[in-house]
From Swiss-Prot:
Residues 231-264, 265-295, 297-335, 337-373, 375-411, 413-449, 451-486, 488-524, 526-562, 575-630, 632-668, 670-706, 708-744, 747-783, 785-821, 823-859, 917-959 form the EGF-like domain. It comes from Danio rerio. Disulfide bonds join 188-197, 201-213, 221-230, 235-246, 239-252, 254-263, 266-277, 272-283, 285-294, 301-313, 307-323, 325-334, 341-352, 346-361, 363-372, 379-390, 384-399, 401-410, 417-428, 422-437, 439-448, 455-465, 459-474, 476-485, 492-503, 497-512, 514-523, 530-541, 535-550, 552-561, 600-618, 620-629, 636-647, 641-656, 658-667, 674-685, 679-694, 696-705, 712-723, 717-732, 734-743, 751-762, 756-771, 773-782, 789-800, 794-809, 811-820, 827-838, 832-847, 849-858. PANTHER family: CYTOCHROME C OXIDASE POLYPEPTIDE VIC-2, DELTA-LIKE PROTEIN. Keywords: Calcium, Cell membrane, Developmental protein, Disulfide bond, EGF-like domain, Glycoprotein, Membrane, Notch signaling pathway, Repeat, Signal, Transmembrane, Transmembrane helix. Residues 1191-1242 are annotated as: Disordered. It is a single-pass type I membrane protein. It holds the Pfam family EGF_TEN. Ligand for multiple Notch receptors and involved in the mediation of Notch signaling. Seems to be involved in cell-fate decisions. This is Protein jagged-1a.
Length: 1242
């Protein structure tokens, strides 16, 4: 049993293949492959629940042992979001032969197993998206029809995208009946590339090109070739572009008139002797040459020098000259001597003697030559030694010796040190033939006069090196610093760029890359794009980050609202053409091709009407009518069949089924039953209707005159009739359904009344009938309407309405067209505001807004976004930066200004830890370790640590807080900076308004190991009467009291003491100055009186006062805590008091410390704060009120001193407070009245 693979392809593929018969290459070519990997059908069942083969075992309720004959069938079509199993397989379909039984598997790499693979070729641009329907079927060979069918075991539907690739994509389907695994891939055929397999590239090396193809299908020229088609040869390197060419790479073929290896030499005129050329066939003469061929010598005197014996030569013409001879000579060339010595030719005292050849010179000593004009060289051979230079003299020589030698021939050693040649040296040593200088450091050279160049490679980054003696100095280029100019000065360190600008450090400067909407050197200018008023027709303008936006009125559109909205009045709206649908194609520019929608069926041609309603009409073929050309015209309506014939309607034709005995197109001809001459023994045949009659002679009887005995024989009665001999004739008794003299006429009772419905034709067949149904009907009596909706023809969830041989698709919302394949483009009306992108969706649209816009149609403007370090934050965004909180408001970034301190790190071997770039992990100092050990703890610091303020004088800008911790509940390794970091990260600390710059710094108490002093400093006062220091301290107390902070460190706080200045009432009226003046006057009078009394008292008791109070009252550290009051949190009263100095007598309200200071002991109570009352109720609801006492005068109930609490200030603070005591009395009193110290016991 072999099942042959089959495949069907879309009409598009066939069309492209026909085109390929005459085109050089197809526009696209590839194939889709599917390979089955495994199948598991444990129960051997079908999707319907029935067994594949045989009945179910009633005992075990399982299928029989006979397994399924499993094969697979695929259908590949265009991408569908809602897959319809009906409709054509537009990309192709195919099936495998029977692969196996219920369960089987194949190796994925078995590429030779064609039995499990289905290959669907395509010749259109692969669209990447697809829908694949995979069916596992049980083979069923219908022997009666010869067709190959199958019953569905399991069906998988896969929609997605796949690009051409050699790699397989493995998919798995887990169905309720069976599970199977398969793999798919799309591969381009040879020479085709790209995502659509529509880029053709075939390597070639011929006249039309010389190239190979890379993996993307791009042409890669072979070596020596260039050009888009790689058919331009690359000539020999250096070959003249103007005068050379080549057809073979590496050659250089010269044009006519040019020569040379590179075709850069012109060919001169033939015969040109002393000339050159610039263009071919020229003859440009060399100097002193002339003539057409440059063969005429214009300087014979210079070339030949023909004049002898001192004659003077003159050029007189081309190739002509004249010699002017000296006295005593003649001839053309002065070659004849007449009186040679007459001209005194012998020089330098030489004696002239005439001879037959002219004259001879007898030269003086030291001279030689024909005329004694050559000085004899007395320096040859060189008589000077030790590289001395010989100077030739007349009849002698002179040696110029090197400095270390002397003498006539430089043989005597000279003492060079006598001339002090060494410039920068310790000493000079004379040597044979020279000397040696022992140079000072930094000098070199034979005479130590050359400064050693210490600048070699020292100054970096373009720095100018100034060479010094035994050293150097670098003059750095702008933007660099350091001894060697090795450090780039970072001009961006000060963060000069505003409004989110990104700073780029440059040489000796910086450059700000401004975010959209800002400009200027530091991005300080906010660009207002609406300043020029670009919006028209009353539109509102909004300035955005990098552009402007015009909010148009209802009837206008465009960037500037300058265009009237179309409303389909100017350009036509989207026309829904019911006659066509678009399919993927590579043969059209848009990638789509229109094909018929088949709305008029197979018997009509669609004609679309040009309006937006999608109306159409069908032009029907001959023989059909109806709206969709679905009705076959009844050609039997005129009853063309005669003689009782039955008319069968056909397409634009009819067929007559004649009654027995008749024939012809319309049954108009009686069949001649005598044509076979049935009568025997000379009987005469008479033709009847569907019968004959024989007139017998000579006593013959029977139907055919063949019997002597009876009128009946075996052929007398037809169709089972019984013959009865009645003497001279016979009679036939016919069987049911037949009549006539010889039972040859069939009764028409089977079709009476007509059993066939819906216009069908009834045809009598023996004793039965057959109904010939009209198109669109089926069944024995044509009573069943054919389901024209199967397979489902409507796309996109359209509803199919079945008619009589027609159907109609009622489309879901958002779709149109005859088969609901057209998605109505809601973006056609441009609903989105200008600058936004409209995305068409099913029955709707979606607007993609540009930055700065929002709303369903992007018509609303949001605040300007902020740009932070290349990141964009939307308007209203909030984020954390270390311990600070930042906000984006209309393009401006505002952050709280809390000093965050150094980052914690773990000490590693490299010393870098996890610190930012430019910082090192520095070990925590021992005095900074709060809960030991802290050996592994570190802090990230740069080379230059900023100064941290760890204490302050309490005022409106600063408060001092002392925290006492229960260290038993704290983990090990807690540092002082970690405690400070926890306080900075409290919500109440880091969310203070950005109008204040806040610093929270900490240090370990020197008096108690479980206390930490915290200084909270604010750079400026709050606005509208707010005091940020009081707000922060109150919030911290409230948070600590409720244990709201999720921190073990904050939860370990046992006591809080606050020292801060009481805020002044901002609403002081005009009476305040008056009251102050009155009080000041009274105070001055009292002070004067007290001062006079103190002078007299001091004179009397100076000796006793010295014994009682030998030291200054301001030298004791206790005075620094004189204003500290310890309070229980159940009764928080902020008081101010002044204590008497040590040595004062009890009970004295006023006493004199010195002549300049008077201390008044005053008790003042301030109202309880809200935080104090809340803390009292939550922590100590039943604690009695605590007694208020002076810090240094507290007594127990039995009169003994209460142990003093360790003071919070260190020695430096004591010195500061001591110096603060020595201020004028008025200033001292004001500060004492405004200072409040509170202690909170937690």
């Amino acid at each position: 049993m072999i099942l042959r693979p089959s495949a069907t392809f879309a009409a598009l593929s066939a069309h492209v293949l026909l085109r390929c018969l005459w085109m050089r290459v197809c526009e696209a070519s590839g194939h889709f492959e599917m390979q089955v990997l495994s199948m598991q059908n444990v129960n051997g069942e079908l999707q319907s629940g029935a067994c594949c083969d045989g009945a179910r075992d009633p005992a075990e309720r399982s299928c029989a042992a006979d397994q399924c004959d499993t094969f697979f069938r695929v259908c590949l079509k265009e991408y569908q979001s809602r897959v319809s199993s009906g409709g054509p397989c537009s990309y192709g379909s195919g099936s495998t032969p029977v692969i196996g039984g219920n369960t089987f598997s194949v190796k994925p790499l078995d590429q030779t197993n064609d039995k499990t693979r289905i290959v669907l070729p395509f010749s259109f641009a692969w669209p990447r998206s697809y829908t694949l329907i995979v069916e596992a079927l049980d083979f069923n060979n219908d022997s009666s029809t010869g067709s190959i069918n199958g019953q569905v075991i399991e069906k998988a539907v896969q929609s997605g995208m796949i690009n051409p690739n050699r790699q397989w994509q493995v998919l798995k389907h887990n169905g309720p009946v069976a599970q199977f695994q398969y793999q798919i891939r799309v591969t381009c055929d040879e020479h085709y590339f790209g995502f659509g397999c529509n880029k053709f590239c075939r390597p070639r090396d011929d006249f039309f090109g010389h190239y190979t193809c890379d993996h993307n299908g791009n042409k890669t020229c072979l070596e020596g070739w260039a050009g888009p088609e790689c058919n331009t040869a690359i000539c020999k390197q250096g070959c003249s572009i103007e005068h050379g060419s080549c057809k073979v790479p590496g050659n250089c073929r010269c044009l006519y008139g040019w020569q040379g290896e590179y075709c850069d030499q012109c060919i001169p005129h033939p015969g040109c002797v002393h000339g050159t050329c610039i263009e071919p066939w020229q003859c440009l003469c060399d100097t002193n040459w002339g003539g057409q061929l440059c063969d005429k010598d214009l300087n014979t005197c210079g070339t030949l020098q023909p004049c002898l014996n001192g004659g003077t030569c003159s050029n007189t013409g081309p190739d002509k000259y004249h010699c002017a001879c000296p006295d005593g000579y003649s001839g053309q060339n002065c070659e004849r001597a007449d009186n040679a010595c007459l001209s005194e030719p012998c020089l330098n005292g030489g004696l002239c003697v005439e001879s037959s050849l002219g004259f001879e010179c007898q030269c003086a000593a030291g001279w030689t030559g024909p005329s004694c004009n050559i000085n004899e060289d007395d320096c040859s051979p060189n008589p000077c030694n030790h590289s001395g230079v010989c100077v030739d003299l007349v009849d002698g020589f002179k040696c110029i010796c090197p400095v270390q030698w002397t003498g006539k021939t430089c043989l005597i050693d000279a003492n060079e040190c006598e001339e002090s040649p060494c410039v920068n040296a310790h000493s000079c040593r004379n040597l044979i033939g020279g000397y040696f200088c022992e140079c000072l450091p930094g000098w070199t050279g034979q005479n130590c006069d050359i400064n050693v160049n210490d600048c070699h490679g020292q100054c970096l980054n373009g720095g100018l090196c100034k060479d010094l003696v035994n050293g150097y100095r670098c003059v750095c280029a702008a933007g660099f610093a350091g001894d060697r100019c090795e450090r780039d000065v970072d001009e961006c360190a000060s963060r000069p760029c505003l409004n989110g600008g990104r700073c780029q450090d440059t040489l000796n400067g910086f450059q700000c890359l401004c975010p959209p909407g800002f400009s200027g050197a530091t991005c300080q200018l906010d660009l207002d794009y609406c300043e020029s008023g670009p919006c028209q027709n009353g539109a509102q303008c909004f300035s955005l980050a990098s552009d402007y936006y015009c909010k148009c009125p209802e009837d206008y559109e465009g960037k500037n609202c300058s265009q009237l909205k179309d409303h389909c009045l100017i350009t036509p709206c989207q026309v829904i053409d019911s006659c066509t649908v678009a399919v993927v194609s590579n043969s059209t520019p848009g990638g789509l091709r229109l094909i018929s929608s088949s709305v008029c069926g197979p018997h009509g041609r669609c004609r679309s009407h040009s309006h937006a309603g999608g109306h159409f009409s069908c032009d029907c073929q001959d023989g059909f009518t109806g709206t969709y050309c679905h009705e076959n015209i009844n050609d039997c309506e005129s009853s063309p069949c005669l003689s009782g014939g039955t008319c069968i309607d056909k397409i634009n034709a009819y067929q007559c089924i004649c009654a027995d005995g008749w024939e012809g197109p319309n049954c108009e001809t009686n069949i001649d039953d005598c044509r076979t001459n049935p009568c025997r023994d000379r009987g005469v045949c008479r033709d009847l209707v569907n019968d004959f009659y024989c007139e017998c002679e000579n006593g013959w009887k029977g139907k055919t005159c063949h019997s002597r005995e009876s009128q009946c024989d075996e052929d007398t009665c037809n169709n089972g009739g019984t013959c009865s001999d009645e003497g001279d004739s016979f009679k036939c008794l016919c069987s049911p359904g037949w009549e006539g003299a010889t039972c040859n006429i069939a009764k028409n009772s089977s079709c009476l009344p007509n059993p066939c419905e819906n216009g069908a034709t009834c045809v009598v067949t023996g004793d039965g009938f057959t109904c010939v149904c009209k198109e669109g009907w089926e069944g024995p009596t044509c009573s069943q309407n054919s389901n024209d909706c199967n397979p489902q023809p409507c796309y996109n969830s359209g509803t199919c309405v079945d008619g009589d041989n027609w159907y109609r698709c009622e489309c879901a919302s958002g779709f149109a067209g005859p088969d609901c394949r057209i998605n109505i483009n809601e973006c056609q009306s441009s609903p989105c505001a200008f600058g936004s992108t409209c995305v068409d969706e099913i029955n709707g649209y979606r607007c993609l807004c540009p930055p700065g816009r929002t709303g369903p149609r992007c018509q609303e403007v949001t605040g300007r976004p902020c740009v932070i370090g290349g990141r964009i934050a939307v308007d209203g965004a909030k984020w954390a930066e270390d311990c600070n909180t930042c906000y984006c408001h209309k393009g401006i970034v505002t952050c709280t200004k809390l000093f965050c301190g150094p980052k914690a790190c773990r000490m590693l071997g490299s010393g870098r830890g996890d610190c930012p770039t430019g910082q090192l992990c520095v070990p925590v100092r021992d005095e900074q370790c709060f809960v030991k050990p802290c050996s592994s703890q570190g802090e990230c610091w740069s080379a230059h640590r900023p100064a941290v303020r760890t204490h302050c004088q309490p005022d409106s800008h600063c408060a001092n807080v002392t925290f006492t911790f229960n260290k038993d509940t704290m983990p090990q390794g807690v540092t002082v900076e970690q405690v400070c970091r926890e306080l900075r990260h409290l919500y109440v600390t880091k969310n203070v308004t950005s109008e204040f710059s806040i610093s929270v710094s900490c240090e370990l108490s020197s008096a108690a190991s479980n206390e930490i002093h915290v200084a909270i400093h604010v750079t400026e006062n709050g606005i509208h009467g707010r005091v940020p220091v009081k707000e922060i301290t109150d919030n911290i107390i409230d948070l600590v009291s409720k244990h709201s902070a999720n921190s073990s460190v904050i939860g370990s706080i046992a006591e809080v003491r606050v020292q801060r200045k009481q805020p002044q009432n901002p609403n002081v009226d005009y009476m305040v100055p008056l009251l102050v003046s009155v009080v000041t006057a009274i105070w001055v009078l009292a002070l004067a009186s007290v001062f006079l009394w103190c002078i007299r008292h001091h004179r009397k008791q100076s000796s006793s006062a010295t014994a009682i109070n030998p030291t200054s009252p301001f030298s004791t550290p206790e005075e620094n805590t004189a204003n500290n009051a310890r309070e229980h949190l159940n009764q928080i009263k902020n008081h101010i008091e002044k204590n008497a100095s040590n040595g004062s007598l009890p009970g004295k309200e006023l006493h004199c410390d010195d002549k300049n200071t008077v201390n008044a002991k005053i008790r003042t109570q301030f109202p309880e704060s809200d935080a104090s009352r809340r803390l009292q109720k939550t922590r100590f609801p039943h604690q009695p009120a605590y007694m208020l006492v002076d810090r240094d005068d507290r007594l127990s109930s039995n009169g003994t001193d209460i142990k003093k609490h360790p003071q919070w200030t260190n020695k430096r603070d004591n010195r500061d407070l001591e110096s603060q005591h020595r201020v004028p009395d008025s200033q001292h009193r004001d500060s004492q009245h405004s200072l409040q110290k509170m202690e909170y016991i937690v």
